[in-house]
Each structure stands twice: as structure tokens, then as C-alpha cells.
A protein has these predicted regions:
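Juxtamembrane intracellular "pre-TM" segments in multi-pass secondary transporters
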Residues: 1-4, 175-210
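Hydrophobic transmembrane alpha-helices of multi-pass secondary transporters
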Residues: 3-6, 10-11, 38, 42, ...
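Substrate-agnostic recognition of the 12-TM MFS/MFS-like secondary transporter fold
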Residues: 6-22, 46-58, 70-77, 95-148, ...
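Short amphipathic helix-loop junctions that connect adjacent transmembrane helices
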Residues: 20-37, 225-240
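MFS-fold secondary transporters
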Residues: 21, 30, 80-84, 99, ...
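C-terminal transmembrane bundle of multi-pass solute transporters/carriers
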Residues: 40-59, 63, 67-73, 232-385
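Hydrophobic alpha-helical transmembrane segments
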Residues: 90-94, 100-101, 123-177, 247-248, ...
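A single, central transmembrane helix in multi-pass transporters
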Residues: 150-157, 196-254
Length: 385
């Protein structure tokens, strides 16, 4: 359990550093170019990096253990951030792609370690996800304040210090491991194709991957940009409420994590999809701010429960040797689906009334009930074998 908390601390340091460097670079790019498009291009750069990492993940892991790969990815992120500090041009976006590429190795590995480090997987996943959301909730406004009161360069230096500390803790974590996952098969068997083949041939892995991917697609209905459009066009209230809506969503996710941390059971995947449909319908039909906030509370909790539940059942049902590869495939699917969803709902918001977009989103969430049911049925099949 000590190793789990060491891993968690390294993840906290890296995540705080991630938020700070992104806030700093967004502000810096906007100041340099005056282009909102350049400042808004970060999600595209991050998605590109995450997608590319999925193409190389299996090959890298065939050469290095999970612990060593985690250390190398964090160390190279630190070196890349040094290059960001030395780069004063729009080419910094290429370095953002590289950092996201390295993150694409770290995140599946961190999730894969959980079943090896702790027995209570639901509790562990609740702690991981809840703390991640708390960092997002706290660090975005704090990061913005740091940049405003100092400079983007100073915020980047603070981020670099955090990356260095994360690297040190990660090295300590790797050295403290008594057992690591090392592939015993032939090197040529561990490829992206082999990972995709496993996901495709295992009913549970296939269904849960489709669930994670489709959930990523429909979750873009609730991105911050659409919430701003909803406030301006539908509720027609002061956009100062935008921050409140975003904070409400994150606080709801943290509360759901706290509940599952103490609970032994969690709602089924299909039931959380139904709850999300209710939230989208309420959000699209109401004309009152209070009910809109209530819908966000409902949706935030349902989303977090799905994230924790899917991670928990994946760690329980997928063999430890296959777990990192399944996570890598899912991460690639997640990133692509999130990009497609953001683009689709953004285009719909330009052409339709925003309330109609949320009602359509409720309709598009319906297949998630069916996919969730298939996932749980295949999970029962695996458990009975």
C-alpha cells in the first residue's frame, strides 16, 4: 500500500505541473500571437500526442518494464519542459505534442499498477480520480492567478520544479517495487496489432473499450465551451456564472469519488447512462439556472461513477500482463472520440439552438445503456469461467 501512495504522490506532482504549464503556455501564446485559435489549439496538440503514443506503446513496453517506462516518460517530460522554457515561438506546440505523447505512456501504466499495489480497487480508483478532479478544480484558478501576478515564464519554472520532484518520487517508486510486469513472450508478439487483436477477441475487453470510447464521445456534450454558449444563448445570464458551472461539475465528481471511496458497491453502468440522459434532458428543457446547476450535479456524479467503475472492472477482469495494452488502446480510442465529439457538438451548437443540442445529446447517449449492459454481461461470463 505504501508503494500505491508513492505512485499517487508522483502523479499529483505531475498533474499539478501539467495544469500550470498549460495555463502558462495558453497565456504566453495568446500574448505573442494575439490569436485565440493558437491559444485554443492545445486540445488538438494534446490529442495528437496521446493518439501517437498508442502506436508505440506496446513496442516500448516490450523493451522496458512498467516501472522503467514510467520513470523514462516522466524524466523526458521534464527535459521537454526545459526545451519549452528555451523556446519562444509557436513551435512550442510541437513540444506540447511531445509532452502529451509521453503522458500517453504514463497514464496507462499508472492505472495498470493499481491492481498490483492494492486489493481494494474501487477505493483506490476513487482516490485517484477524486484527487485528479480536485487538482483540476484548484489549480486552474490558482494557475491563472500565478500567471497574472507573476509571468508565464515564472509559472513554467514552478511547473518544471514540480516535474523534477515528480521524477524523483517516480524513481523512488520504481526502486521500491518488489515485483514489476515484464513480458515473458516473444518481442514480436507485443505490437499494436497484437493489442488490438486481444481487445477484439476478448468479449469483455471489446465491450468495455467500446463503452469507454463511446462515453468519451457523448461526454463532450458537457465541455466548458458549450456551457458558455448555453449560458449566453439559452439562459441569457451573466457569463460570470460560467466558472460556477464548471466548478459545480468538478465538485460533483469529487463528491461521487468520496462516496465510492466509502462504499462497497457502485451503481451499474447502464444505470449511470440513464442518469446522464435525465441530466441532458433537464439541461436542455429548463430555462432556470438552478435546474441547470442541478443537471450538472447529476451529470458530474454519473460521469465520475462511470470512470471509477470501468477502471475497477477492467483491473479485476483483464489479466495483469494484458492490462497496460488494453489501457493504451482505450486511451487512443478515448482521445479520438473526444476530438470527434468536440467537433461535432461544436458544429451543432453553431447551427442549432443550444437547448436542441443537449436534447440531441440525450438521444445520442441512449446507446451507452446497451453497451454498458453488454459490458456487464461479458463481465459475468468472464467471472463464471
Amino acid at each position: 500500500m505504501k508503494s500505491f501512495y508513492t505512485l499517487l504522490v508522483s502523479q499529483w506532482l505531475a498533474n499539478i505541473g501539467d495544469v500550470l504549464y498549460i495555463v502558462a503556455l495558453i497565456a504566453s501564446l495568446y500574448q505573442q500571437t494575439g490569436s485565440a485559435f493558437m491559444a485554443a489549439s492545445f486540445p488538438i496538440a494534446v490529442t495528437a500526442g496521446m493518439t501517437l503514443s498508442g502506436l508505440f506503446f506496446a513496442r516500448i513496453l516490450s523493451r522496458y518494464s512498467l516501472g522503467k517506462t514510467l520513470v523514462l516518460s516522466q524524466l523526458m517530460k521534464t527535459v521537454t519542459l526545459v526545451l519549452v522554457l528555451l523556446t519562444d515561438s509557436i513551435f512550442v506546440l510541437g513540444l506540447v505534442v511531445l509532452i502529451a505523447f509521453l503522458d500517453g505512456f504514463a497514464r496507462p501504466i499508472q492505472a495498470s499498477f493499481i491492481p498490483r499495489l492494492t486489493k481494494n480497487r474501487q477505493q483506490a480508483n476513487s482516490l485517484v480520480q477524486g484527487s485528479n478532479q480536485f487538482i483540476q478544480l484548484a489549480m486552474w484558478p490558482l494557475g491563472t492567478m500565478l500567471v497574472s501576478f507573476t509571468s508565464s515564464a515564472f509559472a513554467l519554472i514552478v511547473s518544471l520544479v514540480l516535474f523534477v520532484l515528480s521524477t524523483i518520487v517516480t524513481i523512488y517508486f520504481n526502486q521500491s517495487l518488489t515485483e514489476d510486469i515484464v513480458n515473458d513472450g516473444a518481442e514480436e508478439s507485443i505490437t499494436l496489432r497484437a493489442s488490438l487483436t486481444y481487445v477484439n477477441t476478448s468479449p469483455f475487453a471489446r465491450h468495455v473499450t467500446w463503452f469507454v470510447t463511446y462515453e468519451s464521445f457523448v461526454s463532450t456534450l458537457w465541455i466548458s465551451a458549450l456551457l458558455l454558449v448555453y449560458l449566453e444563448r439559452h439562459l441569457q445570464v451573466d457569463t460570470g456564472w460560467w466558472g460556477t458551472l464548471n466548478a459545480t461539475f468538478l465538485i460533483s465528481m469529487i463528491a461521487a469519488s468520496a462516496h465510492l471511496y466509502r462504499s462497497r458497491r457502485a451503481p451499474s453502468l447502464p444505470s449511470t447512462a440513464i442518469i446522464s440522459i435525465v441530466a441532458a434532458l433537464l439541461f436542455g428543457m429548463t430555462a432556470h439556472l438552478a435546474f441547470a446547476i442541478l443537471a450538472l450535479v447529476i451529470q458530474g456524479a454519473a460521469t465520475q461513477i462511470r470512470i471509477i467503475q470501468t477502471n475497477t472492472v477492467i483491473q479485476e477482469q483483464i489479466p495483469a500482463t494484458q492490462l497496460p495494452y488494453v489501457y493504451s488502446v482505450q486511451q487512443t480510442g478515448y482521445a479520438l472520440a473526444f476530438s470527434v465529439g468536440s467537433l461535432l457538438f461544436g458544429l451543432l451548437a453553431d447551427g442549432l439552438p443550444i437547448d436542441s443540442v443537449y436534447l440531441l445529446g440525450a438521444l445520442l447517449t441512449l446507446p451507452l445503456i446497451w453497451i454498458g449492459r453488454l459490458t456487464e454481461q461479458s463481465m459475468l461470463t468472464v467471472s463464471s469461467v
